[in-house]
């Protein structure tokens, strides 16, 4: 990317307890103007709720991302592409975006797929590891 763009952060929020967010995750969430979060069909955003238990997100833009649970890989890929496109619109405006994800973003995480799309498109991107449920017990 030649123009100044924002950075995408894939942020792990751990297995459910807001006290298990890493210091790095808290710092990035405090300093990032746009928070992206997976949203269920019923409108629930569990990862965002966990983050809110650790960080005051007042005044931040929330970008809900909808993902399919389809068994069809092409349908899932289309869902990831749509989410990446929504995030990239913010990045092009120079705004950093933190996508919250349950557990650790490097292990079976939706954020990992979005990270790969965004990185492939040439935007700066970072993964912030977190506490897994196995490590939390």
What is the meaning of each model-derived region?
Residues 129-136:
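Short, flexible loop segments at boundaries between secondary-structure elements
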Residues 1-18, 23-25, 30-126:
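Class I S-adenosyl-L-methionine
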